[in-house]
Swiss-Prot record:
Belongs to the patatin family. Possesses non-specific lipolytic acyl hydrolase (LAH) activity. Hydrolyzes phospholipids as well as galactolipids. May play a role in disease resistance. The keyword Hydrolase applies. This is Patatin-like protein 1. The lineage of its organism: Eukaryota, Viridiplantae, Streptophyta, Embryophyta, Tracheophyta. GO terms for molecular function: monoacylglycerol lipase activity; phospholipase activity. The keyword Iron does not apply. Residues 38-242 form the PNPLA domain. It comes from Oryza sativa subsp. japonica (Rice). One of its GO terms (biological process) is lipid catabolic process.
């Protein structure tokens, strides 16, 4: 570290969870000096796919650092959209004794137990078809009640690590991004985590939009939010999260951040987990779509083509953008995207919460672990295998080692500065 940054300055920066590792002048590969980010796509019941992958990663971390290791202990920021936002809350919201509400291994049980009640499988018929034209397919009451019971009065600034959750405001016609970063300095953005999760899950035609208000107790100001699923703008939240982090770097909040340069994005270590898509299978043809009117664009064979297209386009464009950025920085190995573009049938839907399909989705997650590491070809948009990179499971083992080294380096730096850590949750000791 440059001599001008004393141990006192290091200790000040160690006191925050946000970007605990960014230091100018240190090599990007230096343990303890990187920004770690986990991003989780939206996809409804397909949240079982990232649930399976994240359980594998957390198990590898537990092998390295003990059974109490949780993902929130290792990531400076967890970002999620729609079902990914719900997973983000599970991983980052405080539960008993200041530890995360859910272990990653508990995520799939949540979907298996609650999926059929969130998305009850109704019989098809003329009445159901007509109803789908005039209101959302599901009333959302069970999901809303479950989220409120699970998260209680937890607000976004209370999370154990920084979170970023995109939504879309239908009144303002613009994305609204909720983050721990903003909530700490903007009281009107410090919403209940339950309201944020309900909002980011409100996929048009599937679940109702959500309205709520926040109040600034100091000024009495009130803000109203009229929100739907953030997936219409950022179904893959990777770049949104990186933008939030970079924004914090640029404002140079010296109470929270090391003095870093906005160009130091080579210090990111990013894991982006998808929920699968159908892009390699060929979903529709121009000949088919040319004959569609409003009804077919909104509902076709149990799916909502216009919504599916928006969300798939959002995810793929973000992946291409992120891949190009990391390649331009010669940091390809710092960005791992795990995605499967071969889904079909019920597995490709967001609401087929049957027992058979949910088991199949878990199997798809396991299959993705065994697949070779792939990277998007920026010319074709297709995923191609990375020669010599091994399987996604191999890559996650390596990722776990990097995360563990990062955490250990931060703990060592904190102890060297005279900090404590004994008796504290490991996530607190890591981030401080």
């Amino acid at each position: 570290m440059a001599a001008s940054y004393s141990c006192r300055r290091t200790c000040e920066a160690c006191s925050t969870r946000a970007m605990a590792g960014c230091v100018v002048g240190e090599p990007a590969s230096a343990p303890g000096q990187r920004v770690t980010l986990l991003a989780i796509d939206g996809g409804g019941i397909r949240g079982l796919i990232p649930g399976t992958i994240l359980a594998f990663l957390e198990a590898r971390l537990q092998e390295l650092d003990g059974p109490d290791a949780r993902l929130a202990d290792y990531f400076d920021c967890i970002a999620g959209t729609s079902t990914g936002g719900l997973i983000t809350a599970m991983l980052a919201a405080p539960g008993d004794h200041g530890r995360p509400l859910f272990a990653a291994s508990d995520i799939n049980r949540f979907y298996l137990d609650n999926g059929p009640l969130i998305f009850p499988q109704k019989r098809c018929g003329m009445a159901a078809a007509m109803a789908a034209l005039t209101r959302p397919r599901y009333n959302g009451k069970y999901l809303q009640g479950k989220i409120r019971k699970m998260l209680g009065e937890t607000r976004v600034r209370d999370t154990l690590t920084n979170v970023v959750i995109p939504t879309f405001d239908v009144r303002l016609l613009q994305p609204t991004i909720f983050s721990t970063y903003d909530a700490k300095s903007m009281p009107l953005k410090n919403a209940l985590l339950s309201d944020i999760c309900i909002s980011t899950s409100a996929a048009p035609t599937y679940l109702p939009a959500h309205c709520f208000q926040t109040t600034d107790d100091a000024t009495g100001k009130v803000r109203e939010f009229d929100l739907i699923d953030g997936g219409v703008a950022a179904n893959n939240p990777t770049m949104v999260a990186m933008t939030q982090i970079t924004k914090k770097i640029m404002v140079k909040d010296k109470e929270e951040l090391y003095p870093v340069k906005p160009s130091d994005c080579g210090k990111f270590l990013v894991l982006s987990v998808g929920t699968g898509s159908t892009s390699d299978q060929g979903m529709y043809t121009a000949r088919q779509c040319s004959r569609w009117g409003i009804v077919r664009w909104l509902r076709n064979k149990g799916m909502a083509p216009i919504i599916d297209i928006f969300m798939a386009a959002s995810s793929d464009l973000v992946d291409i953008h992120a891949a190009v950025m990391f390649q331009s920085l010669h940091s390809d190995g710092d960005y791992l995207r795990i995605q499967d573009n071969t889904l079909h049938g019920d597995a490709a839907t967001v609401d087929a919460a049957t027992r058979d399909n949910m088991r199949a989705l878990v199997g798809i997650g396991e299959r993705m672990l065994a697949q070779r590491v792939s990277r998007v070809n920026v010319e074709t948009g297709r995923y191609v295998e990375v020669p010599g990179a091994g399987s996604n499971a191999d890559a996650l083992r390596g990722f776990a080692r990097q995360l563990s080294e990062e955490r250990r380096a931060r703990l060592g730096r904190r102890n060297a500065c005279g900090g404590g850590g004994e008796g504290e949750p490991s996530g607190v000791a890591c981030k401080r």
